[in-house]
Every structure is written in structure tokens, then in C-alpha cells.
Amino acid sequence: MLFDQIASNKRKTWILLLVFFLLLALVGYAVGYLFIRSGLGGLVIALIIGFIYALSMIFQSTEIVMSMNGAREVDEQTAPDLYHVVEDMALVAQIPMPRVFIIDDPALNAFATGSNPQNAAVAATSGLLAIMNREELEAVMGHEVSHIRNYDIRISTIAVALASAITMLSGMAGRMMWWGGAGRRRSDDDRDGNGLEIIMLVVSLLAIVLAPLAATLVQLAISRQREFLADASSVELTRNPQGMINALDKLDNSKPMSRHVDDASSALYINDPKKGGGFQKLFYTHPPISERIERLKQM
């Protein structure tokens, strides 16, 4: 059951990434068709923009991410309990020892960052270290180390980059339509009025309008799948599903973080640091903790 869940989560992630690339290609084709008389040209431009966005975000410095979240680096002397747990989990996962940070915040939370295991880091809040016992801390750090081993940060970064590229292209197309660019393009087209042309025009407009929302939903779906995968992978490392269940139960009862956390960083944490409600739940980067616990109980 454990390995079935891991395989299923990986498969779903790759399907969602494929959907992402198709969305980007669709928007690029639509923009090219409407404004430069070449859908294929627009598609190529969109893929290049997405590639540049992804590269620029993947190589963002770990120091920048940690600084944005108010984290300070610790070592074996200053935080021996946390350091040794991370060391043990990294050893079991067969990855290099990540750098270790602490965030001074009473909320219970943790996250990992780094585009690959060679430049990765993990951070935990002081509140988490004060409340979690050894088994629960191992489960949480196993979750974060699993994100590193599974290259989740890189995958999530690619998803954010593609969503940003889609939103940028759609916004650019909207501004051009506002200033009459599409109207001039269509009026100059000697095939204007052809039935197929009208259908293509409508489809292109719908793609430009709806793609940003679709991209956001796909991005969130990828983030949720990687959380499920990290939970299951943590159990694979610790061989202790109850430790992960107990840790998630405590995380669920934790208050929101006291410091502001930007949207990009929110997706990194093991528990959504904002804890919004109502309509905001549709745009959570994390699956409900109750659902995560239920999946662990089925192992």
C-alpha cells in the first residue's frame, strides 16, 4: 500500500505537469494566432518564456529563501537535537546532509528548499521544536528530507514558473486587445469571416481568458500531490506511520505563523502557514490535514 501510494502520487504529478505544458502551449498558440499571424510562432515563444522563467526561479539562492522567512542557520553545537534528526533522515534517504535552519516563531511548521540535494536546506520553527517529541520530529524532518530526495522543490518551482508565464502571456494579450491589436489583426486578415476563422478566434480568446485560472488550479494540484508523496515517503524512511499521524495532528491544531509569509514560500511549508478559511480553501497549496491523516491510516 505504501509503495502503491508513492507510485500513484508520482504518476499524477507527471500527468499534471504535462497538462501544464499543454496549457502554456495553448496560450502561446492563441497569442500568436491573434497577434502575429502565427500560432506556431506564439507557441515557440511561450515555451521559451516558460523555460527562462523556470531557470531563473530554480537557481534562486537558498540564502534568499531563508532570509525571506527569517531563518537563522544552526549547527550540531547550537541545535543538536534537530541537527541529529536531520542527519539521521538524510542518511536513511541517502542524500547529502542539508543545511539546517531555525525560524523563531511559536507556530508549528517546517520547510525544505534547494533545487537539488547538493544545495538543499531544511528549516523548522522554534514552536515545532518545543512541542514535537522525537518520533514526531523525525516524521516532520523525514517529510522535508523526502521533498529534497524527490526533487519536489524543483518540480514545484517549474509549476510556479509555468503558471507565471501563462499569466504574463494572458495579461499581455489582454492589454493588446484593449488597445485594439487583435481587432486590427483580424480586420487585416483576408480570411476574416470564414467559419473556421471565427471558431479559432473564439477558442483563442477563451484560452487567453481561462488559462490563468486553470494554471493556478493545476499548480495547486501539483503542490497537493507532492505533499501526499512526502508524507508517504517520510513513513518509508521512518517506518513509523503513527509518528507522522501524531505530528500532523499537532500541526493541524497549531496557530498561524506570526510573521508574514509570501505566497511562494507558503507552498514550501509542511503546513499552510496562513490557515485561511471559506473561499480561500479552493486555492490551498496543501491538502486538508484530515485527508493526509486518513491516507496514512490506510497504509
From Swiss-Prot:
Zn(2+) binds at H143, H147, E227. InterPro entries: HtpX_protease (IPR050083), Pept_M48_protease_HtpX (IPR022919), Peptidase_M48 (IPR001915). Disulfide bonds: none annotated. The keyword Transmembrane applies. Its cofactor is Zn(2+). Keywords: Cell membrane, Hydrolase, Membrane, Metal-binding, Metalloprotease, Protease, Transmembrane, Transmembrane helix, Zinc. Its EC number is 3.4.24.-. The chain crosses the membrane at residues 15-35, 39-59, 158-178, 198-218. The active site is at E144. Gene3D superfamilies: Metalloproteases ('zincins'), catalytic domain (3.30.2010.10). It is a multi-pass membrane protein. It is found in: Cell membrane. One of its GO terms (cellular component) is plasma membrane. One of its GO terms (biological process) is proteolysis. Belongs to the peptidase M48B family. HAMAP family: Pept_M48_protease_HtpX. This is Protease HtpX homolog.
